[in-house]
Amino acid sequence: MRALAAVLVLAGCAALPGEEVGGLFEVYRDTDVPIVSKALFEPERYLGTWYEVARYPVPFEAGCVGVTAEYAAIDAETISVKNTCRNPDGSERSVIDGTAEIVGPGRLEVSFPSVPFGAADYWVLWTDEGYRTAVVGAPNGRSGWILNRDPEIPEDRLKAAREVLDFNGYDLDRLMMVRQ
């Protein structure tokens, strides 16, 4: 999702009214707090479609609603990534395709050929037991998301996901819910 940044920044996306944008290099977590990826991460269970239900404000997703990420296996260590951003009226704004290399338990490096910034750290910090909800972050604290298999997230899983972000040093006051 981070690499969606370049496409949307270059396209000059505008924020929705009242939406905080954040800077490209804004940090949303205390980087002195250790960040922990999911040790028992099962990539095959992570595959499929995820809905972005919450995120930290970043320019590359300014104005995006109904954001989805689709993951499919390429081989044992590589996952295809397709991120879709929609306009508030539901029309498709942008789609970006890339790959994620598994570099450790719950740790991926995501790259998009059309983006000149190189690979980005994408750490799965937590999933619920059924892989219905996931928390994703980055050691540099410049991004973070709560993903869910359905557009609506149950309150108990949202609460658990927020606790994971807090545990990993993220500022919960800056987390914004995403309209589906």
Predicted regions and their residues:
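Sec-dependent N-terminal signal peptides
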Residues: 3-11
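A beta-rich soluble binding module of mature secreted/lumenal proteins
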Residues: 13-180
